[in-house]
């Protein structure tokens, strides 16, 4: 699979209780214990490059910096944790009153990343990888995202979509 897929995104939401709450199997059991060793093996097979573990934070885990750091503590070096896209009526949807906490979490995460980097135990956090002088590459400026060209979402059932936000749209 490494020669066919240049970059792979592995879905894991962070701490066991957070992940298992949002990504259980059909019968209700959590998936964390099954996927973590497989994801670790995959990341190592790529020498910690050309992959991301990608999680989603929700109203239920506004302390998401703990999830990012948990993933780093598991040995992952390429990490992305993003805000949930949800209907405002969904219990897990982020709310306006969550914003001060979320802003603080990004500050905590940045400080911890600097500390770990100085200790030789750094990791990449996708949303902090910004070219402050040139902005996004020309391709990103023109297209906005990689949906359908450099990004593909695969559901647990094997269905393919150009982006995770399109899953279920037929």
Per-region residue spans from a language model:
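Conserved SAM/AdoMet-binding glycine-rich loop
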Residues: 1-17, 48
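A conserved non-catalytic segment of reverse transcriptases
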Residues: 6-9, 35-39
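Radical SAM enzyme [4Fe-4S]-AdoMet core and its adjacent flexible, acidic
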Residues: 17, 21-33, 40, 44-157, ...
């Amino acid at each position: 699979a490494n020669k066919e897929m240049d970059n792979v995104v592995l879905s894991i939401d962070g701490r066991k209780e957070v992940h298992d709450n949002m990504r259980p199997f059909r019968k209700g059991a959590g998936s964390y214990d099954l996927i973590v060793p497989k994801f670790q093996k995959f990341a190592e097979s790529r020498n910690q490059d050309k992959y991301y573990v990608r999680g989603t934070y929700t109203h239920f885990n506004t302390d998401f910096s703990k999830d990012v750091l948990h993933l780093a503590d598991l040995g992952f070096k390429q990490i992305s944790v993003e805000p949930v896209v949800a209907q405002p009526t969904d219990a897990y949807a982020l709310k306006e009153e969550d914003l001060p906490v979320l802003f603080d979490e990004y500050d905590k995460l940045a400080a911890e990343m600097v500390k770990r980097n100085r200790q030789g135990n750094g990791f990449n956090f996708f949303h902090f990888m910004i070219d402050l002088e040139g902005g996004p590459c020309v391709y990103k400026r023109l297209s906005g995202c990689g949906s359908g060209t450099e990004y593909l979402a695969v559901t647990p059932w094997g269905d393919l979509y150009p982006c995770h936000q399109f899953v279920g749209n037929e």
